[in-house]
Amino acid sequence: MSVTGTEIDSDTAKNILSVDELQNYGINASDLQKLKSGGIYTVNTVLSTTRRHLCKIKGLSEVKVEKIKEAAGKIIQVGFIPATVQLDIRQRVYSLSTGSKQLDSILGGGIMTMSITEVFGEFRCGKTQMSHTLCVTTQLPREMGGGEGKVAYIDTEGTFRPERIKQIAEGYELDPESCLANVSYARALNSEHQMELVEQLGEELSSGDYRLIVVDSIMANFRVDYCGRGELSERQQKLNQHLFKLNRLAEEFNVAVFLTNQVQSDPGASALFASADGRKPIGGHVLAHASATRILLRKGRGDERVAKLQDSPDMPEKECVYVIGEKGITDSSD
């Protein structure tokens, strides 16, 4: 059974329950405001946040937190459910086109919602170009592989170019100014700021208008802020929390999360992470486990680029060729 774009939108909106609903279960308005100040805007987020973390929010005692948790549990069932219900939830998943039909094909339709997709590769492979292309294709109608929605873009390296968005939008015959207006942009100054920006996303996403979160690139700030083996453990703990939050946002708001990542040379790298030439994505096991889909990008012949699907819960390993043009990521003319 196919699910239409309208049905997906209505289902997503129906499942986004504001914390204001808790007022009907005895939680006063001042405590709800405290939740919002702590970056918690929906009932689902209340349920997925630990009591220990909720108690860290200024003004919330253990007694209040327990009462809030109890009220949230009355609104949304969090125990065992029939697998048929989970099937209904999975049917709300849809894909966003990358701009390349060949790449969309090996991905099973495109970048999937409710999960994290990571692309990694050396410089000039098209990671940022793919991010820019997705900013436009996400706004296309459903029948054209879009999501008819907005994009939240976190830029960690200062490589976001609004003029490039306008150029790609013109290639798709969309209004350039409207496309730019539908992209919420933030420059992450360091890893701490990057994590804060993701915490703040709950308020934006609770509108139900967003379809995609882009982080370009996920590890740049963490590499700078945590240097050497002595800080590696702390870095991975922070990264794990960051990725956990992104995954929660993807599931709760039915959005796609698209991460770009850098690579490092490691001649002795294990086959689990490394490509044939020994390059491997940074972030280790933490990032590998968080990303549902991992795609290696590399340079091909001439202007061609090669995308290899390395890990996916839905599709087998496969690769395809794409090029970077005025419309962003497109198919090779060959």
Curated annotation (Swiss-Prot):
Chain sites annotated for binding ATP: G121, E122, F123, R124, C125, G126, K127, T128
Keywords: ATP-binding, Cell cycle, DNA-binding, Meiosis, Nucleotide-binding, Nucleus, Sporulation
Cited Pfam families: HHH_5, Rad51
Binding-site list for ssDNA: R223, Y226, R229, R235, R305
Chief place of localization: nucleus
GO terms, biological process: chromosome organization involved in meiotic cell cycle; DNA recombinase assembly; DNA strand invasion; meiotic cell cycle; meiotic joint molecule formation; mitotic recombination; reciprocal meiotic recombination; sporulation resulting in formation of a cellular spore
Subcellular localization, as worded in the UniProt entry: Nucleus
Gene3D superfamilies: 5' to 3' exonuclease, C-terminal subdomain, P-loop containing nucleotide triphosphate hydrolases
Disulfide bonds, paired cysteine numbers: none
Residues holding dsDNA: R223, R229, R235
Tagged with keyword Cell cycle: yes
One MF term in the entry's GO annotations: ATP-dependent activity, acting on DNA
Keyword Ribonucleoprotein assigned: no
Domain of life: Eukaryota
Subunit structure: Double stacked ring-shaped homooctamer. Forms a ternary complex with MEI5 and SAE3. Interacts with RDH54.
Role: Required for meiotic recombination, synaptonemal complex formation and cell cycle progression. Recruited to meiosis recombination hotspots by MEI5 and SAE3.
Family recorded in the similarity comment: Belongs to the RecA family. DMC1 subfamily.
Record protein name field: Meiotic recombination protein DMC1
